[in-house]
Amino acid sequence: MLELDLQRASQQPAPSDEQFRQWCELALRQRTADSELTIRLVDEAEGRELNHTWRHKDYATNVLSFPADVPDELLDIPLLGDLVICIAVVEREAAEQGKELQAHWAHLVIHGCLHLLGYDHIDDDEAEEMEALERTLLAELGHPDPYADDES
């Protein structure tokens, strides 16, 4: 079972709680243990502040992943971590990249969840593995390959 804490810290419209749950459960289905996850939806100011604090980048980014660092045995429900998603950046990227907004949301939530599971894209081999899984999961939702334009 997934315990999802969805925090809407921005007044901007965003997908429904049910959609976030669907995307998270899809990305996390390989994990058999119960899990707890927080997603915080923020405005650009908070997104920029968090990105500056944690990554030393002075701009808001689409999604930040904060894996939990607490041993599972110390918790009633294992804590995967937190995702922080900047609504304005998601909307802007979708428009600039010509992507359907819902597909971009799904991609970023899945991408963030995979980071919480330990996937990364620092080197090419890791990136290929992570992107292949993202493509597969998004295809199950009927969404196009989010990296198709990157390869042309």
Curated annotation (Swiss-Prot):
Q: Give the source species.
A: Pseudomonas fluorescens (strain ATCC BAA-477 / NRRL B-23932 / Pf-5)
Q: What does this protein do?
A: Single strand-specific metallo-endoribonuclease involved in late-stage 70S ribosome quality control and in maturation of the 3' terminus of the 16S rRNA.
Q: How is the cofactor bound?
A: Binds 1 zinc ion.
| An example molecular function term from Gene Ontology annotations | zinc ion binding
- Cofactors that this protein relies on: Zn(2+)
Q: Which family does it belong to?
A: Belongs to the endoribonuclease YbeY family.
Q: Which residues bind Zn(2+)?
A: 111, 115, 121
PANTHER family, A to Z? ENDORIBONUCLEASE YBEY, CHLOROPLASTIC
Q: What is its main location?
A: cytoplasm
Q: Where in the cell is it found?
A: Cytoplasm
Protein name per its UniProtKB record: Endoribonuclease YbeY
Q: Which UniProt keywords apply?
A: Cytoplasm, Endonuclease, Hydrolase, Metal-binding, Nuclease, Ribosome biogenesis, rRNA processing, Zinc
One GO CC annotation, please?
cytoplasm
- UniProt GO BP: rRNA processing
The record ties this protein, via NCBIfam families, to: rRNA maturation RNase YbeY (TIGR00043)
What EC identifiers does the entry list?
Answer: 3.1.-.-
